[in-house]
Amino acid sequence: MSAPLLKVSGLRKAYGAIQAVGGVDFEVLPGEIFGVIGPNGSGKTTLFNSMLGQIEPDAGTIELNGEDVTALGPLELNRRGVGRTFQTLQVFPRMSVRDNLLVAAQEHRGSMWSRMFAPPDSGLGAKADALIERFRIGHVADKRAGELSYGQQKLVDIAMAFMSDPALVLLDEPCAGVNPGLVSGLARLLRELNHDPALGSRSSFVVIEHNMDFVMDLCHRIMVMVEGKVMAIGTPEEIRCNHQVLDAYLGN
C-alpha cells in the first residue's frame, strides 16, 4: 500500500466546554477521493479549518507527505501543494474569469494585493486557458465573475484551486447552492481531474458535503463524523450497510 498523502492523528479542538473535534484519526492515499460526512455540529468544519491552517488544533498532528504541517498557515500549505475551496465563494466579482485564475496562481507570492499586481509568470495564461476549457466555462472566460450564475462561479472557484497544481484539494460543500442539474456534471469533472494528469500531477481530494448521492457516487472512501468523533470509515457500500451509521445519521 502507498504511503499516505495526508495523515491526521489524534486531532482535537475544543471551544470552551464544547469538544468540536475529539481525537480524529484518518489517512488519505495518493489519488484518493475521500469524503467526510456528518450532521450539523459533527465537527466537519472545525476539522476542515484545522487541515487548512485556519485554526490551530489543541492536540494531534497533521502530516503531508510525511512532513508535520500542523503549525503551518494557509500560505505555507498552498506552497506544499494543498488547494482548497470554501463554502463561501472566493472569486473576485469585478475581475474576469480568466483573471481570477491568474490571480489564484500567484497565491504563493504573498498577500492578496501583491498577487493582484505582481507580473504574471510565463505559462500561466496557457494553464488558465486549459483549465477554463476543462471546466467548460470558455464561453464566459472574459466575463466578470460577478455576472455569472452561482453554479458557474462555483466552477470558477474550484478551477482557481487547480492553478497551483495541487497534490491535495480540500473541497468544502462543493454542491451547496448548485443547481441539481449541474451536480452530476461536477462529479464527472472531479473524477476527470482525479484520473487525468494532463493538467499536472494526479490530485487527491477531501470532500465535505451534505449531498449524500454526490458523496456516494464520487468518493472512494467515506468518513462519518458524529459529535466530533469518527463513527466509521469505509467504502460507499460499507457505509451504506453500516447499521450504526444508518441509525445515527442516514436514517432508514
Which residues does each predicted region cover?
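Glycine-rich phosphate-binding loops of nucleotide-dependent enzymes
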Residues: 2-252
